[in-house]
Amino acid sequence: MPGFLVRILPLLLALLLLGPTRGLRNATQRMFEIDYSRDCFLKDGQPFRYISGSIHYSRVPRFYWKDRLLKMKMAGLNAIQTYVPWNFHEPWPGQYQFSEDHDVEYFLQLAHELGLLVILRPGPYICAEWEMGGLPAWLLEKESILLRSSDPDYLAAVDKWLGVLLPKMKPLLYQNGGPVITVQVENEYGSYFACDFDYLRFLQKCFRHHLGDDVVLFTTDGAHKTFLKCGALQGLYTTVDFGTGSNITDAFLSQRKCEPKGPLINSEFYTGWLDHWGQPHSTIKTEAVASSLYDILARGASVNLYMFIGGTNFAYWNGANTPYAAQPTSYDYDAPLSEAGDLTEKYFALRNIIQKFEKVPEGPIPPSTPKFAYGKVALEKLKTVGAALDILCPSGPIKSLYPLTFIQVKQHYGFVLYRTTLPQDCSNPAPLSSPFNGVHDRAYVAVDGIPQGVLERNNVITLNITGKAGATLDLLVENMGRVNYGAYINDFKGLVSNLTLSSNILTDWTIFPLDTEDAVRSHLGGWGHRDSGHHDEAWAHSSSNYTLPAFYVGNFSIPSGIPDLPQDTFIQFPGWTKGQVWINGFNLGRYWPARGPQLTLFVPQHILMTSAPNTITMLELERAPCSNDDPELCAVTFVDRPVIGSSVTYDHPSKPVEKKLMPSPPQKNKDSWLDHV
């Protein structure tokens, strides 16, 4: 008998230990699900509704993630919503970026640490006023590819990408101890022409395979049967989006036609609206947003405020709409937190509304970050683009009988220089012409170093030029951002059609893909000798409206003896026209004060240095404010206040811009403006 007890004692101890452990695991099991009987979410078995705000980690530097998230929490939000831009993480096939500003896992973990839940929107298409709606440009290497469909080439790329991304997200799901409560599949698919349910089913299966059967998957579409017809799919919970101009009852009735039971959800309640170059800055009155938010919350609905902070389209990440209208660098969105993360009147008004329904955290709200006006900084001309081709295109040009697109020369963003020779004398001005929509998006034209003007997509398609037979014809073509919404997201860039000179097709092109990023980062002003006046002839003979595209460089030091520097600032461009600007190799984005409405660019403090002078590099594309005779006129100014909504915008040289290419949402009914988008 004692021997028997000795043998079974370990087993008895194991059973005693196992019982409490299993009970504890069941007691602490995390669950987030839909209770269809009570029309609500259940969080760990208790009724729950989220009040969320959109923040795009790709538009806010990592340096400021915690600051922005804390401000969102202190506003009374219990969740955030964010997109995952595919092209932000896989710039080239199989080359992934998940560190520093691209570290989405850290961003989500940080939200979790701060007590915020997450609504994740991993696409693969996201819209978001982001370059190509988040789809990587390299997909267009298959020229006939049908994006956002069951096209085999597209599905293969999507399957591979989601096979990388979603396993990273699975440990962050709520039921696995993380913050992610729901995951969106695709994005407003009902607004796309393809209406391919096989594609949606493929995504549904892929998401389930990688994330499991317990996670709540959902779709978002405009609150109208037209959009829900192709956007909703059985097995994915249907949600809607609408703004202050919509009838809330009608909007949620649209959702109810697809989801008779379950929580009411507005996945994008618009706190503001997007901007386009050459159009007035969009705003929505605080009172209208607050009133509509109150009405939504009074119905017991879950809601996401799009945007709560907009942020910045750094570098080349802005998108565009059709008819072609590119979005500016600022994505301020008239949101409750400004582009720079500052508290606004709208922030406090919405906090007060939320406080009527949910407990708002106590304690101090993180203040707006201080700004500093560093003043005027002189710049000098470094080199024209044409004089720097050995630096900008070290691998050499590509020869082609006819023009090639950016994708065909392995260039995704930025600039490509197209060069040929004039086949005939043009002593009298001869028309250089592109078919309508043949230049994507702007071409800066010169003949033998003499600026001739600009060809512009959908706008200027013919330019009269002069020159002798055999003269060098240069077109520096700029990608202004790929279309992010609608049927034309397969937006090829460059010279996408043949050009003609007096009706004769131009051939024998030499094409230079320009690596401006590496040139700026690697050289930062050390490009050998500067231009020494040998282009003065171009100044003398060119139209007064244009100069050759050229790089300019300047340096400034952070003042000593002032505590807490560096601080955020804004760079202003008095007298400059259009171009790209870098500080210490960081691509701030596009400036275009000649067109507006944005006149300043946000400069976050973390890119500035106190230990050494800071280097400003500018690529001015149209006209600098100085010449070799007046170099002191080349300057920028650092100010402590943004100007993103100039009241009057003028195109270069001096003509008013046609406004409202894409209407802002009216205050009455969003359904009407959706018909125009």
From Swiss-Prot:
Keyword Signal in annotation: yes
GO cellular component, as recorded: lysosome
Residues bearing carbohydrate: N26, N247, N464, N498, N545, N555
Entry's EC annotation: 3.2.1.23
Signal peptide span: 1-23
Compartment annotation: Lysosome
Prodomain positions: 24-28
Oligomer and partners: Homodimer. May form higher multimers.
Superkingdom classification of source: Eukaryota
Family from the record: Belongs to the glycosyl hydrolase 35 family.
Catalytic activity: Hydrolysis of terminal non-reducing beta-D-galactose residues in beta-D-galactosides
GO molecular-function terms, A-Z: beta-galactosidase activity
Protein name: Beta-galactosidase
